[in-house]
Design a protein with these regions (language model features):
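A structural signal for beta-strand and strand-to-loop patches characteristic of beta-rich domains
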Residues: 1-182
């Protein structure tokens, strides 16, 4: 699960009975860096909080994490990734990093952010941007263990929106993305 670092401000642990109704309780949790081997996880310095209430999180740096929580007799592990638009490389090892901040251009004129990349070396990425039947832009770029971030602002020539196409091949495998922004 990829999460934009600036948007993850709170978490909430739902503690429910069999009928799905919230019940009082406390939860112990800790957030630790993800490990490649399950045996390497060490859980200590737990934080205790009330269940069913928003819990403010301290700012965290980009990276891969595990949330380990205990509530009653239940134990939950959730892995997640935090990243920012300022990251220059994927924060995890991945052949395919693609992120689009929204599928709609904001009415206030602010941009939609696009990130494309991989932790692999030597990629040749090709792309095209269409509005209806009109080609707006085509191009390519080379990158190695990096992310390319673009700010896309709405332009009148886009009409009802644009379609983005990005693709690259690595070790005989095609990675491609087609997304629309209205």
């Amino acid at each position: 699960d990829k999460n934009l670092r600036d948007s993850l401000k709170t978490i909430k642990f739902d503690y429910l009975n069999m009928a799905g109704q919230p019940i009082d309780g406390t939860v112990k949790y800790v957030i630790v860096p993800q490990q490649k081997d399950e045996k390497l996880y060490v859980y200590k310095n737990y934080v205790t909080a009330k269940a069913n209430e928003d819990i403010a999180l301290k700012p965290m740096s980009s990276g891969a994490y595990r949330l380990h929580a205990i509530c009653g007799t239940d134990t939950v592990n959730t892995d997640f990734v935090l990243f920012s638009m300022d990251d220059k490389q994927p924060v995890i090892t991945t052949h395919d990093w693609f992120y689009l901040s929204d599928n709609f251009f904001p009415r206030d004129g602010s941009p939609v952010y696009l990130q494309v990349g991989s932790s692999d070396k030597n990629q040749h990425v090709v792309y095209s941007i269409y509005a209806g039947n009109k080609v707006i832009e085509t191009g390519s770029f080379d990158q190695s263990n990096s992310i390319k971030t673009r700010k896309l602002f709405y332009k009148e020539e886009y009409g009802d929106g644009i379609t983005l196409n990005y693709a690259w091949v690595k070790d005989g495998v095609l990675y491609s993305h087609m997304q629309s922004i209205a």
